[in-house]
């Protein structure tokens, strides 16, 4: 194996922002934007974009499709293991770098991959029929450091494996990207309108007045009955908590990229993303990190506990204080923290798993959340894929104990979750990884936009309050769709 294999990294100057540049490539196949749209001093420091992958890996059940240019190959096996093997040849050594992602795989793992991590029933309807995972592998990415206000091109030269050829290709790809950036700075006046960021005044001026119907996969009565059924399972000792969700669908009357611009304007989030993949376009504004790996350090940040934002400062303060001091919400958060500690303990060194933040209040444009942070150090020989298999899917969106909670989810939710509550993010050539929990996210397929919202049910839960909480979590998504003042919610 070649040692000391590094990428080429060059700082560049551009007059356009990351969202504006992505607007110029958003309609290209396999274009992506991993967008940190919040305070750059904390979680919103870096954004990444790119297109033209040299390798695409997607899976349906145990059938894995591998695309290299015009060549298509089908393999069979566990998708997690196959993805790990396919990425293994493309490795970079760790080196000092200005950004954490130096090229690699970008894409999604759907919740339905849980059938490869646990033995579970599968009775819910798979009506969206999307691949259960899809990762595109990029040799060149454009990175933004929002704190330092710098931009970088990272070029790796893959899939070339011979070192001289790899570096030659890396230099060529770097120069191509610089030429593209120069061209955009010259012609941005032609391309910029509608490509980048959207302010509140522009958002309001574009507000549509027509009525749009949201269709749920639950009737309100069915959702209430399902909440109470979960409470019965809890009373019987089956579980402590179950995350129950409902999915909405609406006809999409704007482009997916326009929807992304609107969602970014109304709900900037630290773990947002846009994936323009052939079978689905994903627009995410997730506030939650599932797993971050940097060298051997692992971090997960489960979110559990929600209140809507108030209409004024006094109401805002009251709701924030109510959430902070809610025994129910803190108990939910603690249950999930214990679950995540156990999951990390399966692959981390003994004594390294620690809770560094417990149920701290975080403020978002439409809601308050309670968030905790759990960290650990991976055991020698454990890969990021091993970690993913041990912890997937995230405990904050299943319940506890995890396996029984997932069995109940399959029983009570009428349709498969697909990408919802799975993960979006990157797996780097240097084996670093950062992936979110897919919440506050649109799945766009064949002219329809789907989004799913839910909450953690415990014995003390009030069914009607839980139903309302799902609507609170949908506020930013509904506003991004720019629905009419009269929003009609219809049952399935």
What are the residue ranges of the model-derived segments?
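Extended alpha-helical targeting/anchoring segments
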Residues: 1-492
């Amino acid at each position: 194996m070649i040692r000391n294999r590094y990428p080429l990294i060059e700082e560049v100057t551009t007059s356009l922002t990351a969202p504006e540049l992505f607007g110029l490539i958003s309609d290209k196949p396999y274009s992506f934007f991993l967008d940190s749209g919040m305070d750059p001093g904390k979680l919103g420091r870096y954004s990444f974009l790119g297109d033209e992958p040299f390798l695409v890996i997607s899976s349906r059940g145990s059938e894995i499709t591998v695309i290299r240019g015009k060549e298509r190959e089908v393999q069979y096996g566990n998708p997690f293991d196959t993805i790990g093997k396919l990425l293994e040849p493309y490795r970079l050594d760790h080196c000092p770098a200005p950004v954490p992602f130096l090229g690699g795989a970008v894409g999604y793992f759907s919740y339905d991959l849980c059938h490869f991590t646990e033995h579970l029933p599968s009775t819910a309807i798979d009506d969206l029929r999307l691949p259960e995972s899809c990762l595109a592998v990029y040799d060149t990415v454009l990175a933004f450091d929002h704190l330092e206000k710098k931009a970088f091109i990272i070029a790796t030269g893959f899939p070339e494996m011979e070192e001289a050829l790899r570096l030659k290709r890396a230099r060529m790809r770097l120069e191509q990207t610089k030429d593209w950036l120069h061209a955009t700075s010259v012609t941005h006046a032609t391309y910029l309108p509608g490509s980048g960021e959207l302010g509140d005044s522009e958002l309001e001026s574009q507000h549509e007045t027509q009525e749009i119907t949201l269709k749920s996969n639950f009737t309100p009565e069915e959702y209430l009955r399902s909440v109470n059924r979960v409470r019965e399972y809890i009373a019987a000792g089956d579980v402590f908590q179950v995350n129950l969700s409902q999915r909405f669908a609406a006809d999409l009357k704007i482009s997916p990229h326009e929807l992304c611009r609107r969602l970014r304007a109304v709900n900037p989030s630290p773990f947002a993303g846009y994936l323009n993949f052939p079978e689905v376009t994903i627009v995410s504004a997730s506030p939650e990190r599932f797993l971050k790996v940097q060298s051997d350090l692992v971090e997960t940040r489960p979110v559990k506990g929600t209140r809507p934002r108030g209409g004024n400062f006094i109401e805002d303060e009251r709701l924030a204080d109510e959430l902070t001091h809610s025994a129910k919400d803190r108990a939910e958060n603690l249950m999930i923290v214990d679950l995540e500690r156990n999951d990390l303990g399966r692959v981390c060194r003994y004594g390294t798993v620690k809770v560094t933040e417990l149920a701290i209040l975080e403020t978002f444009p439409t809601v308050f959340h309670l968030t905790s942070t759990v960290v650990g150090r991976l055991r020698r020989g454990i890969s990021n894929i091993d970690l993913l298999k041990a912890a997937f899917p995230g405990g904050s969106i299943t319940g506890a104990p995890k396996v029984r909670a997932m069995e109940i989810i399959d029983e009570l939710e009428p349709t498969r979750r697909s990408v919802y509550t799975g993960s979006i993010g990157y797996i780097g050539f240097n084996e670093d990884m950062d992936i979110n929990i897919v919440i506050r996210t649109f799945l766009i397929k064949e002219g329809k936009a789907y989004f799913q919202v839910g909450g953690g049910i415990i014995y003390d839960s009030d069914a009607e309050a839980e139903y309302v909480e799902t609507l609170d979590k949908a506020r930013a998504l509904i506003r991004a769709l720019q629905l009419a003042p009269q929003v009609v919610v219809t049952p399935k």
